Amino acid sequence: MEFSPPLQRATLIQRYKRFLADVITPDGRELTLHCPNTGAMTGCATPGDTVWYSTSDNTKRKYPHTWELTQSQSGAIICVNTLWANRLTKEAILNESISELSGYSSLKSEVKYGAERSRIDFMLQADSRPDCYIEVKSVTLAENEQGYFPDAVTERGQKHLRELMSVAAEGQRAVIFFAVLHSAITRFSPARHIDEKYAQLLSEAQQRGVEILAYKAELSAEGMALKKSLPVTL
């Protein structure tokens, strides 16, 4: 996926009210960006970081600029727009860049399923194969080269794991897919130190037949693509 038009660069002043961030451009202008990330954004929003943002041509938007990427002061590139996790995963599936998810003839998005009436991110189908249910999570929390999810307690994420276990019990294929959107991450684990219940459920889900995949994106201000499978340790 290529950014078109190209992203613009600025320096982060502060993120606040969860959805807003003030930046200063190279020519000295101060702008307020929309921040499309409701998480803690630990390590992704330090004042002084380089920010890459897009600009919408929708004149009705109060904040036409959207924060897309951070380049930390240590040099790591991080995609902070959580919407890209699903977009990049869909692109990779359609391009058959994810070997574990190749060979299907149909891809559907936002399909209702399960006893808790969730919506699965993607459902893959093919003749003579079980349906494949895929839940996507964006990974941006890093400690050294270790990636973690979640970055805050997530009851919604816990619900998704319960739903996937039910799918696997019914004989369908269930996959939790971690889209790693941080250039410094080389391996993935659940964030037991943040959400112990989620980590416990993820281990239980694997034991009950839910597949766990983690793929890392190549990230730049020019574009992004999921490319590399990462090791997962529970």
Curated annotation (Swiss-Prot):
Pfam families: SfsA (PF03749), SfsA_N (PF17746). Keywords: DNA-binding. The keyword DNA-binding applies. GO terms for molecular function: DNA binding. The keyword DNA-binding applies. Binds to DNA non-specifically. Could be a regulatory factor involved in maltose metabolism. This is Sugar fermentation stimulation protein A.
